[in-house]
Amino acid sequence: MLYTLIVGLGRSGLGLHVPVLSRARSQVPGIFADHPIVGVDPGDTARAERRDLLIADSLRRARDLLEPARTVVHLCTPPAVRAEVLREVAALGFSRILMEKPLAGDLDTLRCVLRLAREQELRLAVVAPWLHSTLTRRLVQLVGNRRLGAVRSVSVTQHKPRFRRSLSTGSHTSAFDVEAPHAVGLLLRLLGDAQLRGARCADLRVGTTTVPDMGGAHLELLHTGGIRSAVLSDLSAPVRQRRIVLGMEDGSVVGHYAVGQDDDFAQWEITRDGHTTREVFRDDSLTACLTHAYRGYAEGGDGTGAGDLGLHVRTVELLDEAKRLADLSPAGGTHPHKEALSHGR
């Protein structure tokens, strides 16, 4: 059975992974060892004690509390320091690594991560709840069986208010790293590989404070089959929304992903011949994602499969290109692709 080490006790590690794993350990027998989850926070930002969490003051101390050969490491540190922490984790003998999305924040970090994985024989998997979502599975089936004919276009909207975290922490430096990795991975799964056709980002402004590149992100893709897709993520929106719209040859589909762990239900609306049907269903995608990874590791695999890792690599490549395109500016000029979202205080 497998032990758990969570590295990085911020929003993802402490706020999402710990409670989801605590539930999964009681729901999925035969995979998880009867041992507390061990957590380490390299940034020393979280000292909250929980009954189901044992906090170690260093990675070396965590190694002494666990068996590295039977431990899954959840790497929940910010993208900018991920390669450095991965190197330290690997040096301590851990090899099963479950990484928060995105796999890397840029191409240099991606190359470093993949090189470490090869040299240290790491079994990498990426936390990608949308790829394990019931809604995604239904969408893949609908596109594949051509129930509504061929896909004409797809758009993904990812809105949420992220003021406090963007103003108080530097865990992310680009809106392309917050919600967009979910959407790009989903689009690659649904429609196949793609080329970037446009990108822009927005600064977040609250009163006199500006957080560069954290107001929102927009990108456009052209897939190999000729289908166009778009992603729009507004991190200053007043409400949460995670929506996908498929324009089909014989109708349309609107899907709504669960917007938080407090209400894990998704829904979709299918319109055909002027008639719309709506269905609501349970969709605990993060639990499904983590248990899938643990089952893969328990069976001796890499947690997700080589194909999934390739999809995550391609996601990083497209997002890195989007960041560079959004930052393009003529000499001496302003950013032509950058908007500013301004909010009074």
Give the residues covered by each predicted segment:
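C-terminal helix-rich "cap/oligomerization" subdomain common to oxidoreductases
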Residues: A24-G30, P42, V72-H74, H292-R345
